[in-house]
Amino acid sequence: MSKVLIVGGGAAGMFASIFAAKNGNEVHVFEKNEKLGKKLFITGKGRCNVTNACDVDELFQNMVSNEKFMYSSFYGFTNQDVMDFFENAGLRLKTERGNRVFPQSDHSSDVIRTLELEMKRNGVHIHLYSNVEKVVAEDGRFSYLVMADGSKEEGDACIIATGGVSYQTTGSTGDGYRFAEAMGHKITEPAPSLVPMNVREEYIPALMGLSLRNVQATVYDGKKELYSDFGEMLFTHFGVSGPLIISASAYVGKILQKKHELKLVIDLKPALSEEQLDARVLREFDANHNKQFKNAVTGLFPAKLLPVMIHLSGIDPEKKVNVITKEERMNFVHLIKHFTVTLTGLRDFKEAIITRGGVKVKEVNPSTMESKLVQGLYFAGEVLDLDALTGGFNLQIAGSTAYAAGSNIW
């Protein structure tokens, strides 16, 4: 039996404590907040998307960084294992669009409560308001924690599960990176991911609140396509957000961080080819041939988007439809298929769902999450240089890495 000290009482820390305790270890969780699972409480808009019910192979496809590192842990504790864990603990689950798995109650508090009950059932010692200042190793092995009040907590093993630096109001302030660096670990520079993006065009605030459904969004660096997907997006006072944009940020964030502008091209009518769309526009023009242009195209766009599209078309809004040239019409059709804005940067960590970057995984054993540099030191969750798309995949990473760490300490 080992004395296991876990730094951080978020998803990864809670999971890891349960698995370590099931092995018969004496387990202590140190959480600096007044309660456990503070970030979990707000995930999935307060509903907590616990995992994704896709095939296990698809878990890797939805990872953005270091998916090969997760091979052992994803298969060691699969998405089905996560679902079984909660169901066996008494939490009923449901699967929604995109295979997203939520508690039937739609309350993240029920997920946290279930994890807490399992911790208590397995004898985990929970220490709230417990701020760890240092993680100390001696002779290449974990030795003790130094608390904020100067006291020491000795143990045989330590799992760092402090999360990243997104949603800092929940206590995610990057402590784990500092602890890891102090023991010789290299850190991939943390950056916001799954985050809205800023746009340069000055008409963007006029579109604030406009949601576009069933559009194709493609991000280009010059002529090089970086990301493309179909779905829903939202305009804000600063730029763009919504599911498509949040996912895109995971792929294009590194380039935007280098102060490099990118083009976001939105196909407003992806179900139609340019020829089919031209035929549709022609029908609108024929039906309204005596109307002014601004009044003839109201059926093509949401009301908020209409003045912007008319302005960008370069066609006089007062012009009668029956005198619009073929060239003007074709340019208008092209605009509908290629509505383009300039991405200038990511929003900051306060708005990021997760953190990209963290403890370099080359220095961590992928089967056990133990440090290759310090014996008895383990990592779990977002503190590692691992990130994935939305849909329950990041919580699956938390669960799988926590299982690998906790279940391998005896």
Model-derived features: where do they sit?
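N-terminal Rossmann-like FAD-binding beta1-loop-alpha1 element of flavoenzymes
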Residues: 3-29, 405-410
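Glycine-rich FAD pyrophosphate-binding loop
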Residues: 21-45
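A glycine-rich dinucleotide-binding beta-alpha-beta segment and adjacent secondary-structure elements
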Residues: 127-129, 134, 307-387
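An anion/pyrophosphate-binding glycine-rich loop and adjacent beta-alpha core
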Residues: 34-36, 41-42, 50, 56-57, ...
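Feature captures the FAD/FMN-dependent oxidoreductase FAD-binding
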Residues: 76-157
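Glycine-rich loop(s) and the adjacent beta-strand/alpha-helix scaffold that form part
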Residues: 157-203
